[in-house]
A protein has these predicted regions:
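Surface-exposed, low-hydrophobicity beta-strand/loop segments enriched in small/polar/acidic residues
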Residues: 1-211
Length: 211
């Protein structure tokens, strides 16, 4: 029997908590240049390449030193896990405060500062969402782990958490496995893509989809 061809793919999403230091920790650098990342090749959300959660970046003045006279550029990989994205001209934080990017990333590869920075750390903001696929697709199945908080796992007919929710799965208020029934033909998403929102009820989920 020959090999079976299939277009079904899988993506893994695991919710992350807000962090101050997982990208770079408490750095003081003279003049313009690059922040030194905790991993030279770039830092993934949740620290794992397999995690496709997309998150904004926190830039924090960890002490009373003000860094709002400096601008930052953040470069990395976007929510699709492939495309390079960036946000430029971000005004740095005042003393003991945080600024957050509008852009979201699955991996940060470079953070550039325009001038001297003092006691600056960078980390990912909390996130529970990510892009399943950036075009027409079908959800074929999923396997997840629920948390101790009841909630909803939602899938948007879009490439972001906006628009019509086509699939909602309630989750129990207990740590448990989640293996819901999905019809044989799947659930079709025919707009700009399919975007997953784990909410508070899901710790992680693997989504099987047409890609």
């Amino acid at each position: 029997m020959g090999a079976m061809n299939t277009d079904v793919k899988a993506k893994y999403f695991k919710a992350i908590s807000s962090s101050t230091v997982d990208i770079c920790a408490n750095q003081t650098n003279s003049g313009g240049g690059d922040m030194t990342l905790t991993t030279g090749t770039g830092v993934f959300t949740g620290g794992s390449e397999s995690n496709r959660i997309a998150a904004a970046v926190n830039i924090t003045s960890t002490a009373g030193d003000s860094n709002n006279g400096v601008t930052f550029n953040v470069v990395g990989i976007g929510k699709d896990g492939v495309s390079t994205v960036s946000e430029s001209g971000i005004t740095g934080p005042a003393g003991s405060s945080t600024v957050t990017t509008g852009q979201v990333y699955t991996k940060v590869t470079q953070i550039v500062h325009s001038g001297t920075v003092t006691n600056v750390s960078c980390g990912f903001a909390a996130s529970t969402s990510g892009l399943v696929f950036g075009g027409r697709t079908r959800i074929r199945g999923l396997h997840g782990v629920s948390s101790a908080t009841a909630g909803e796992l939602q899938f948007y007919n879009n490439d972001s958490a906006s628009g019509t929710v086509l699939l909602t799965i309630d989750t129990p208020n207990q740590d448990d496995m989640l293996d819901p029934y999905i019809p044989d033909d799947g659930v079709v998403f025919d707009s700009n893509g399919c975007f997953a929102s784990l909410g508070t009820g899901i710790t992680s989920v693997t989504v099987f989809y047409d890609g």
